[in-house]
Amino acid sequence: MAIVKVKPTSPGRRAMVKVVNKDLHKGKPHAALLDTQSSKAGRNNNGRITTRHQGGGHKHHYRVIDFRRTKDGIPAKVERLEYDPNRSANIALVLYADGERRYIIAPKGVTVGQQLMSGSEAPIRAGNTLPIRNIPVGTTIHCIEMLPGKGAQMARSAGTSAMLLAREGVYAQVRLRSGEIRRVHIECRATIGEVGNEEHSLRQIGKAGANRWRGIRPTVRGVAMNPIDHPHGGGEGRTAAGRDPVSPWGTPTKGFRTRRNKRTTTMIVQRRHKR
């Protein structure tokens, strides 16, 4: 994997920085593990915009990822590493001894030809998946389940990981990259090691068109709108917002907490915020 600064042949390429990985597969993905997906452009089933700044972008198939890793005791060989346009992490195509192929999130350090295992008897090695009750305290883990059998939900993006801090009864404490400490049931599964493609954060898009390829539309400032469109809008000429920053619906932004999921608050031992 290499960081490549593009030759400045145009203003759009002057600031562009790419992450090049020559180990990735250059052919087509495994057809049996592809699914179609249509662009929603941020609209819900009524056609109303529920998520702004989405639309357009290149069409691509969804790669069906195995987030459960439930084929216990069956060794799997890494056939190849692939790029996935749906996520920041790379993915690995693994071939199980019974002939089945699956995609998984590619862990850091896992190479083509390496053998992976899952289950409570799997060795503590990068890429292997075990129940948290069988993982030693202090181990770096990723792809962590929040409910047993539901599939990995935490620490799945490029370069992320968590640390297993302690086990108390039927729960374990896990520290995430954000600093948050959460309780997780010991029957939940996690994968040893970190997620690969850790240099993803070093890339520079370089130009607005590259974001349009990814389906990201422009973000218009509130002060550039009319009063009917945003609380910051209006005024003669260039004017300040005239109030503390808020969203288009009047909710304070820039640090204002909006989390209201009281049902899972008991699972958070320490919040990521300092105060």
UniProtKB/Swiss-Prot annotation:
Ranges of Polar residues composition bias in the record: 38-53
Signal peptide: none
Keywords from the named record: Ribonucleoprotein, Ribosomal protein, RNA-binding, rRNA-binding
Lyase is among the record's keywords: no
Cysteine pairs bridged by disulfides in the record: none
Alphabetical GO biological process terms: cytoplasmic translation
Keyword Metal-binding annotated: no
PANTHER family linked: LARGE RIBOSOMAL SUBUNIT PROTEIN UL2M, RIBOSOMAL PROTEIN L2
Stated role: One of the primary rRNA binding proteins. Required for association of the 30S and 50S subunits to form the 70S ribosome, for tRNA binding and peptide bond formation. It has been suggested to have peptidyltransferase activity; this is somewhat controversial. Makes several contacts with the 16S rRNA in the 70S ribosome.
Family recorded in the similarity comment: Belongs to the universal ribosomal protein uL2 family.
Protein name: Large ribosomal subunit protein uL2
Species for this entry: Burkholderia multivorans (strain ATCC 17616 / 249)
Upper lineage: Bacteria, Pseudomonadati, Pseudomonadota, Betaproteobacteria, Burkholderiales
